Every structure is written in structure tokens, then in C-alpha cells.
Amino acid sequence: MSVDARTAYPGSRPPANMQDESDVEEEALVNNYKEQVHFDDGMSELDRTTSLGAASQTQGLQAQLAAAATPLEFQATLETKFASYDNYCSLFHYILNSDGPVDLEVPSYYWAWDVIDEFIYQFESFCRYRNRVARTGSNEEEAQLLRENPNTWGCYSVLNVLYSLIQRSQINEQLAAIKANEDPMAVAGDYGSRPLYRMLGYFSIIGLLRVHCLLGDFSLALKTLDDIEMNKKAMFARVMAAHFTTYYYVGFSYMMMRRYADAIRTFSHILVYVSRTKNFQKGRESYDAIAKKNDQILALIAICVSFHPTRLDDTIHSGLREKYGDQFIRLQRGGPDALPLYEELFRSACPKFISPTPPDFDNPALNIDPVDHHTAVFMDEVRNTLYNPTVKSYLKLYTTMDLKKLAGFLEVEPEQLRSWLLVNKLRSRQVRWSEGGLLEGEIVNSSDLDYAIEGNLIHISETKAGRRLVDWYLRNLARTY
């Protein structure tokens, strides 16, 4: 099968719902992954570690294409990182600014993802390294070299490349045409009709999601995916690493925007998918990286469930109990003892945030670690909701209760309790996605407990949905037979 045929978009299909939890759809997703694993067209065994070997056998631009997907050495020197940046600039300049579209066949069907992934990884690691050198002042020679090259691996340059690839390929217009059941080739143009540009443009959208999330702009991160449908037919779902990355950053963005129900749904999808395909991933190079990310998502979903208690898939719940056990129970219980645990889990599972601007090498004390900054923002949210589980446990026992009486039970001042109740009520109103773009949704009450305060009297009402036993039986019957 040619690259053209493998990367061509489906002609027309109706919009699919992102929240597709039926076992039929899940099994179809797993079967689709099996086909990808066993598909053999002469390039299925080509992976990132063999790209260097391919580069040595080719000439010119073809060698650059393969080399661009090759990971940089873990302890690469600063000069090597500068040279890698220059190589990427040269490659993207040629692809974007040639007199006409570059007519090249890509080395493999997932090459475009490898290039964008490695490009952003090197940008992220360089930014963190530069910030660390500026804060510690441990190597004056390297600090001087970094000071003299502020634009190397600059945020503007990286974003410019990603946006240019998207614009040149007309990929957003193509995706919009697919949604409208129209022919994407009618709007693709000379560049977008070629696999090289179409694939680079498509995965640049996923790259933008990642970069904006690393920069802390979570709303813009989700906005970039407006034209991509989050379902099993999307192109990113054909590449396991891209599939995992997309759902990780979408879920994390939802979590930081306090849309915990959407974050749990997003994380649950990819965790279930990985659990059903892990037997086909073992032995592949990306397996260890995915297993590590899987543990990170388990930590994030534990945090989200502590803020928004909900039923989880049996597989996920078992994974949480096995991985965290008592820690998971402590999170759900809340209170001051849970604070260090929240910070530990967040730091271990969050992206490695970066700063959009170069650090101040002359004033090291002014440089803040972006991870520390976002952790502090997150911990402020934790402190605001730390006593919600305890407060709710008392409220569930009554239909009306005096504010001062409850304050006495909790051993806090009445006005302090009033502020807790207000925060808890505000946090229980969340935007929940149903259809449309990822930022869209309707405001719903995410808690099974509601209350209103009249003077010093608390009026409490509890609405708990019954368990849908029919769905439970159908799911388990399908698994058994």
C-alpha cells in the first residue's frame, strides 16, 4: 500500500461523539490497533531507532527527513543542541519556502509524528536546561553561550514552524470539509494534497496542543483541536504515541480548568484503551514510555476523582487500588494530611512546564521554575477545597442545619465555614462537554449534594442517581460471551 493510500482521509462520515463508551466501539478500537500492529508493508518495522541507519543510506533531503525523527542523545552537548536546532530550521525552511511543494515520499507512515514529537521534545528539554543553568549559575561558560543566543530554540520560532505547517497544508480546512461531508481535496491546494504536508500539518495541530499546555495556556491548547474529532477514526489514533499524547494533554488541560468530569472521561478513555491493547504493545520500543505515562495518568485521575467523586471503569479502579492503595483513600478523605500527597502526585504526573521567554542570567534569583509556579497554582486550588469531603459528610446527615452548629462540629469559625460552603458550591458547578469543540459544554451540578444558606440556616437536598444495572449486565455479558 502506498503512503498516499494509507494517509488519505475517509471520504465522508457523520460526526462521532467523543464520549463513546460502548464495548462495541471499544472492541473496534482494539481491533483497529491490532491491524496496525500486524500490518506489514515493508515499513512497519521501521522505528525511531532505525531512522539513523536509514539516513546513512540515503542522500540529501531524504537523509534529513529520516534524521529529523531521530532522538537526540540524552547527554548531548550544548553545541549539539544548537546544531540540531539549525538542522530543523534548514529542513522546515526548505519544506515551507521552496518554489513549489516538495515532492517526497515520507520514510514511514508515522514519520511525521516522530518529527513533530522530537522537535517539541528538544524544544522543551532545551528550555528547561536553559532555565536550570540560569537559576543555578553552575556553568558560567554555558551561561554566556546561552546569553549570546537567546533566539535559539525560541518559543516564537517553534510556534511559527507549527502554525506555518498547518497553514501551508490547509489541514484545518480539510478537516472542516470532512466534518461537512465534503471532499477535503477540494480545499487542500497544491501543498495539502501531498502526504508530506498533510501529515506534518495534521500532527502540528497535536504539537500545538502540547506546546500551549507546556506554556500554561490550557484554553488555547484545547482550542487548537477544534477541527479534530476525538474518535477512533482520527489519524492520531493510528499512531499509539500520538493517541496517548493527545488524550494526556487534553485531560490535563481539562483538569487545570477545573473541568474534572471531562478530565476523568478523557483519562478513562485512554487508560481503558491501553489496558486492552497492552499485549500487542509489549516488545515495541514505545512500550516503556507508554507504561510510564500510564502511571502518570493514574495519578491524575486519582486527583480528579478526589475533587469529583464518580464511578470508574473496573479496570481503572483496580489499577488505582493496586498502584496507590492507601494514598487514594487519603486523597478522598481530604484534610491537611492530604496536602503533601497532592503535591507529590501532581509533580510526578504533570507536564514539564516551560517559560515562553529566556531567563535572566544576570539575576538568577528572579528566575522561577515553571513547574514550581504551576504546582503553586494547583496547590492553591487544593487548599480551597481541602475540607469539602468532611463538610459534605456532615451535610449528608441532615436536611436543615444551623451554620454555627456545623462550625462547632468542625471546630472552625462560622464565617470560615461559610466561605468553605461557598467555594464548595461554586466548584460543584462545572462545565461538561456534550458536543462541539472541546471548550464547549453546559454548566451542570457535578455533585449529588446541593444546599442553600438562608441567614445561618443551611437547607440541604441530596439527589443520587441509581445504578444502571441493565448497562452493567450488558457490558459483562458481552465480555463473557
Curated annotation (Swiss-Prot):
Which Pfam families has this protein been placed in?
Paf67
| Location of the protein in the cell | Cytoplasm
Instruction: State if Protein biosynthesis is listed as a keyword.
Output: yes
A single GO molecular function term of this UniProt record: translation initiation factor activity
The family database entries (InterPro entries) matched by this protein are listed as: eIF3l, PCI_dom
- Keyword annotations: Cytoplasm, Initiation factor, Protein biosynthesis
Where is region (Disordered) located?
1-22
Say which domain of life the source belongs to. Eukaryota
Q: Which residues form the PCI domain?
A: 262-457
Q: Got a GO cellular component term for this one?
A: eukaryotic translation initiation factor 3 complex
Q: Quick one: a GO biological-process term for this protein?
A: formation of cytoplasmic translation initiation complex
Q: Which residues form a coiled coil?
A: none
Against HAMAP family, the record matches this protein to: eIF3l
Record note on quaternary structure: Component of the eukaryotic translation initiation factor 3 (eIF-3) complex.
Q: Can you tell me which family this protein belongs to? A: Belongs to the eIF-3 subunit L family.
What this chain does, per the entry, is described as:
Component of the eukaryotic translation initiation factor 3 (eIF-3) complex, which is involved in protein synthesis of a specialized repertoire of mRNAs and, together with other initiation factors, stimulates binding of mRNA and methionyl-tRNAi to the 40S ribosome. The eIF-3 complex specifically targets and initiates translation of a subset of mRNAs involved in cell proliferation.
What protein name applies here? Eukaryotic translation initiation factor 3 subunit L
The protein's organism comes out as: Coccidioides immitis (strain RS) (Valley fever fungus)
